[in-house]
Amino acid sequence: MDNEGNNPTLSFVNGNSMIEHQTLVHGIFELCARIRDQKPLVHVVTNFVVMNQTANALLALGASPTMSWAQEDAAYMSKISDALCINMGTPVKGRIEVMKTLMTLAARMDKPVVLDPVGSGAGAYRTGIAKALFALAPRKIIRGNASEVCSLTGTNYTTRGIDNTLDLEHARQILAGHGRTHGDGEETGTDEPGWPSILVSASSLIVSGQKDMILAPGRRMILDNGTPLMNSVTGTGCILSALTAAFYAVTDNGFDAAVAASAVAAIAGELAAEKASGPGTFMPHFMDALYNMNEKNLAARLKVESTAS
C-alpha cells in the first residue's frame, strides 16, 4: 500500500510544547478511519497462545489479518501484505527461521514491521533471538514491556519470564543511558543532546506498562490510560503489537502509528472494564470497544504527558 503524500501530519511534539488535545485526538481517529477504509492486510506471526484473539482484534479494528507461519508462504505473504508483525513468543526453531525470512523480505520490500520481543532478557536463548531479529529490518517499531525493550540495549539486564520487572522511570533511565546519538548515528555521550541509540535501528519504541511510553528520535510521549484488568488476561500486549502494525500500514510515520495504537488499545481496555464483571467477560467487551471506537471516546478519555525526548 502506497501511503506517500496521504499521511496526516500529527506533529505530536513541537519542541517542548504538547500538541493541542483535540488535534491529537482527531489525528488518531483519522488513522482509525483510514484503517477501516483501506483494510490493510497485516501478516502476523505470533505465539500459539494468542492467535485467535489477535486475529479478532485486527478484524474489530478494521484491518485484515493473515496468520501464516509456513516458510513456503513467506515470499507470497510478504508481497501481498501491507505490514508485518513478529511476536517471538513460543520460539520454536522452525518458527524463528520463518520470522527471520519474513523480516529479511520486509526489509527488501520496504514494508513496515512491528517486533514484539516476548521474554527477551529471560535467558540467553530468547535474548539472542530478539537481538538477531532486531538487526534484520530497518523500518520497524519495537513494542514490549520495559524489561523486554531494555534487554535489547546490550546491557546485562535480565527479566523474570515474560513479566516486567522495571518501572517506567527506570526504563527511561536505562534507555537514556544507552548512548545518545545524532541523526547520523554518531555517538554523542549521555550528557549531550540526542536520543537513545537504539532508535537509530528502530523508528519508534513502545514501552508498555501501567503507563505507556512511546519514543522516537527527538520525541517522547507518555499515555496514562488503560485498566488493571488488561493484566488479568493473556494477550493484550500481543494484541497491541498487531494493532500497531495495522496503524503502521496506513502511515509512514512510526511515531504516529505507535501513539495511535497505544491510545486506542488502552482506551478500549477502559471501556471494556466498565462493562466486564471480571477477566472472563473482559475480552469480548474489549473487542466490541475496538469495533465501536469513535472520536468522542478518544477525546473524553485520552490522557497524555508529552515532552521532547
UniProtKB/Swiss-Prot annotation:
Q: Which InterPro entries match?
A: Hyethyz_kinase (IPR000417), Ribokinase-like (IPR029056)
Which cofactors? Answer: Mg(2+)
Q: Which CDD domains match?
A: THZ_kinase
An example GO biological process term is: thiamine biosynthetic process
Q: Which UniProt keywords apply?
A: ATP-binding, Kinase, Magnesium, Metal-binding, Nucleotide-binding, Thiamine biosynthesis, Transferase
Q: What are its E.C. numbers?
A: 2.7.1.50
Gene Ontology MF annotations = ATP binding; hydroxyethylthiazole kinase activity; magnesium ion binding
Ligand binding (ATP): R143, S208
Role description: Catalyzes the phosphorylation of the hydroxyl group of 4-methyl-5-beta-hydroxyethylthiazole (THZ).
Q: Per its record, how is this protein called by name? A: Hydroxyethylthiazole kinase
